[in-house]
UniProtKB/Swiss-Prot annotation:
Its EC number is 6.3.2.6. Belongs to the SAICAR synthetase family. This is Phosphoribosylaminoimidazole-succinocarboxamide synthase. It comes from Listeria monocytogenes serovar 1/2a (strain ATCC BAA-679 / EGD-e). It catalyses: 5-amino-1-(5-phospho-D-ribosyl)imidazole-4-carboxylate + L-aspartate + ATP = (2S)-2-[5-amino-1-(5-phospho-beta-D-ribosyl)imidazole-4-carboxamido]succinate + ADP + phosphate + 2 H(+). It holds the Pfam family SAICAR_synt. Pathway: Purine metabolism; IMP biosynthesis via de novo pathway; 5-amino-1-(5-phospho-D-ribosyl)imidazole-4-carboxamide from 5-amino-1-(5-phospho-D-ribosyl)imidazole-4-carboxylate: step 1/2.
Amino acid sequence: MTNELVYEGKAKRLFKTEEAGVLRVAYKDDATALNGVRKESFAGKGELNNQITSLIFSHLAEAGIESHFIRAISETEQLVKEVSIIPLEVVVRNVMAGSLAKRLGKEEGEQIPNAIVEFYYKDDALDDPFINDDHVLYLEVATTSEMDTIRQAARSINKVLQELFNQMNITLIDFKLEFGRDAAGEILLADEISPDTCRLWDKETNQKLDKDVFRRNIGNLTDVYTEVLNRLKQVQN
């Protein structure tokens, strides 16, 4: 196993492997907020996110949605197909919350009849600004056809995830996706899907079961991530 680091982000490290086109992802215990301004470490967080992402990506594969995920290889690591990440954060919103509620002057918790799909330019120095299709084309981030593919994939993923989280008695408020191009130019779902990248509320109590407990100092991060993993395991069995 090689330890040549390819990339290090806020929550993960990517390493080369002996197999061409395959990378090893190591999940970190770090949690960040405010685009990295606030940072803390939580023992076991990397393991939780690796397990949650592995289960969710496997579930999506069973539903016919392809991703870069190959398999988990340890408590904190997984193998993935190497892709060139498209610098877009694709946010799917089912319920008013967070920045969207502030931007539109709406109350948190208001249901959105048809899910909203948004694009944000992935650039920490610019604080990941909200952009539209014309910006994407101007920046040469993706073509019109690729944006259509990404939007369609995001809506398909949303449908599958809503059904999954409903079984877990959790409301999928919103979530962030990233996509990449493989060696053949095919667009694949990439990155992770975990409480780091989703807003999740308990259906009965509206308890927040995601990174908002860290952002807002309203709970124990590892406790709520463990709760999500336990519910996920229950519906997967």
